[in-house]
Amino acid sequence: MADTQAKDGYYYTEKHEWVKVEGDVALIGITDFAQNALGDIVFIDLPKPGKQIKAKDSLGTIESVKAAEDLYSPISGEVVETNATLGSNPQAVNAEPFDTWMVKLKNIQTSELGGLLTAAQYKEYVSKLD
């Protein structure tokens, strides 16, 4: 999967989550590599707004026809919103993994972004998984 997508302007984890900072909030989702590995996503369980999350805490569960995996937060913050569309259309993550955020955090700890991977670093990391 050396051609796995990774977009500039996003930060990545080795567990295949991404974070995109927009102003004072962060959007979190899963990468193209993750959705390919999971296969058809059938259900996503996410936290309620107001929940305080620390980096590497579980944000919920993603279930596919192949497996169930935990979604981990790349950074700390407070859940301000979850993507309501995913309740009725979890497959949106398969179609557009970078445009389909799952959780929106506020009061984010931007200092934690330095511990994440850039797009180039993530592509290199994924290329070694083949």
Curated annotation (Swiss-Prot):
<dbReference type="InterPro" id="IPR003016">
    <property type="entry name" value="2-oxoA_DH_lipoyl-BS"/>
</dbReference>
<dbReference type="InterPro" id="IPR033753">
    <property type="entry name" value="GCV_H/Fam206"/>
</dbReference>
<dbReference type="GO" id="GO:0019464">
    <property type="term" value="P:glycine decarboxylation via glycine cleavage system"/>
</dbReference>
<dbReference type="InterPro" id="IPR000089">
    <property type="entry name" value="Biotin_lipoyl"/>
</dbReference>
<feature type="domain" description="Lipoyl-binding">
    <location>
        <begin position="25"/>
        <end position="106"/>
    </location>
</feature>
<feature type="modified residue" description="N6-lipoyllysine">
    <location>
        <position position="66"/>
    </location>
</feature>
<dbReference type="InterPro" id="IPR002930">
    <property type="entry name" value="GCV_H"/>
</dbReference>
<comment type="subunit">
    <text>The glycine cleavage system is composed of four proteins: P, T, L and H.</text>
</comment>
<dbReference type="GO" id="GO:0005829">
    <property type="term" value="C:cytosol"/>
</dbReference>
<dbReference type="GO" id="GO:0005960">
    <property type="term" value="C:glycine cleavage complex"/>
</dbReference>
<keyword id="KW-0450">Lipoyl</keyword>
<protein>
    <recommendedName>
        <fullName>Glycine cleavage system H protein</fullName>
    </recommendedName>
</protein>
<comment type="function">
    <text>The glycine cleavage system catalyzes the degradation of glycine. The H protein shuttles the methylamine group of glycine from the P protein to the T protein.</text>
</comment>
<dbReference type="InterPro" id="IPR017453">
    <property type="entry name" value="GCV_H_sub"/>
</dbReference>
<comment type="similarity">
    <text>Belongs to the GcvH family.</text>
</comment>
<dbReference type="Pfam" id="PF01597">
    <property type="entry name" value="GCV_H"/>
</dbReference>
<dbReference type="InterPro" id="IPR011053">
    <property type="entry name" value="Single_hybrid_motif"/>
</dbReference>
